[in-house]
């Protein structure tokens, strides 16, 4: 009975180790989903399992968490099988709870520092000027505006990696001192950020190339499997169309946001298709279909926005 009286705020014993891996325990998930189930939902669920849960077990069910624990004791739910729970939630039309049936811990929602700063400055600076200046002023000559997409560093002679990041290792004391001197930014210097763009061309299908070209007549099953694996690996390496890695430098927050929007909505991919999927590449691959894969690290984008925020703050200073 002590386990049935456990409060939702209490931590289950198995949850301590799983918190380090960004996971919920199964019982913690029961707490989250069960607290959102109404008494009517619990009655309907208990009625649906009248033939599965005995009278004594059903008499101990007081809320949604107790019902889910009863399902676990009956072997209907475990850490690798939520199918029964998902099906029951769909039956009682509680589709709003389906995203919570997971052991993956949700990330805490944090306010965006850039949006927060823009909102504060729009109230602090824009509004007073609008009230104090009833007559519109002539537009001031703006500074030289950089292009929409800054110049990127990437090779022009084929799919080679252009700029490799330094290997992570333990540097010497002298190099650490030099790095400290060079990395320290000037407070008045304009900050920039680097966004790494990865572009790769691939065949859409490899089955046609592997069929009929992978064969082994060795008697031992392990040797036969190993030889076929080596043959398939050699064929796939020969079909590698290469990749390009570019570091794009941004100094304006608006251009960085525009670049990220184009990446999210697919405009960047469509624009790069005309650059990388050339007529010579199509002629080399023949009639096989190829696709272009584009990747930008979201973490680089978020760190870059925070870094370029400093430029806006410096511009706002008198």
From Swiss-Prot:
Residues 25-103 form the DED domain. It holds the Pfam family TRADD-like_N. GO terms for biological process: decidualization; extrinsic apoptotic signaling pathway via death domain receptors; negative regulation of protein catabolic process; negative regulation of transcription of nucleolar large rRNA by RNA polymerase I; regulation of apoptotic process; spermatogenesis. It comes from the Eukaryota. One of its GO terms (molecular function) is DNA binding. Residues 128-147, 160-191 are annotated as: Disordered. GO terms for cellular component: cytoplasm; nucleolus. Widely expressed with highest levels in testis. A scaffold protein that directs CASP3 to certain substrates and facilitates their ordered degradation during apoptosis. May also play a role in mediating CASP3 cleavage of KRT18. Regulates degradation of intermediate filaments during apoptosis. May play a role in the general transcription machinery in the nucleus and might be an important regulator of the activity of GTF3C3. Inhibits DNA transcription in vitro. Interacts with CASP8, CASP10, KRT8, KRT18, CASP3 and FADD. Homodimerizes and heterodimerizes with DEDD2. This is Death effector domain-containing protein. It comes from Homo sapiens. The gene is DEDD.
């Amino acid at each position: 009975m002590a386990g049935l009286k456990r409060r939702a705020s209490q931590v289950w014993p198995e949850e301590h180790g799983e918190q380090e891996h960004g996971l919920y325990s199964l019982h913690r998930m029961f707490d989250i989903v069960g607290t959102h189930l109404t008494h009517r939902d619990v009655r309907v669920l208990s009625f649906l399992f009248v033939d599965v849960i005995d009278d004594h077990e059903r008499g101990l069910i007081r809320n949604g968490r107790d019902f889910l624990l009863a399902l676990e004791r009956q072997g209907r739910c475990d850490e690798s099988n939520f199918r029964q729970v998902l099906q029951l939630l769909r039956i009682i039309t509680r589709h709003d709870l389906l995203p919570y049936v997971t052991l993956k811990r949700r990330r805490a929602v944090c306010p965006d520092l850039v949006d927060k700063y823009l909102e504060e400055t729009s109230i602090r600076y824009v509004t007073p000027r609008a009230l104090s200046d009833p007559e519109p002023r002539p537009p001031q000559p703006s500074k030289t505006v950089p292009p929409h997409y800054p110049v990127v560093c990437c090779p022009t002679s084929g799919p080679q990696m252009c700029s490799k990041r330094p290997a992570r290792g333990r540097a010497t004391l002298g190099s650490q001192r030099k790095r400290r001197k060079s990395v320290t930014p000037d407070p008045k210097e304009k900050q920039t950020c680097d966004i790494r763009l990865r572009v790769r061309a691939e065949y859409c299908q490899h089955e046609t190339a592997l069929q009929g070209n992978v064969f082994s007549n060795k008697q031992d099953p392990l040797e036969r499997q190993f030889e076929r694996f080596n043959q398939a690996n050699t064929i796939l390496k020969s079909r590698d169309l290469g990749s390009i890695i570019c570091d794009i430098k941004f100094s304006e927050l608006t251009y960085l946001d525009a670049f990220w929007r184009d990446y999210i909505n697919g405009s960047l991919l469509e624009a790069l298709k005309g650059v990388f999927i050339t007529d010579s590449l199509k002629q080399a691959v023949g009639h096989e279909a190829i696709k272009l894969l584009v990747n930008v690290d979201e973490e680089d984008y978020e760190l870059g926005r925070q870094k370029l925020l400093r430029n806006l703050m410096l511009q706002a200073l008198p």
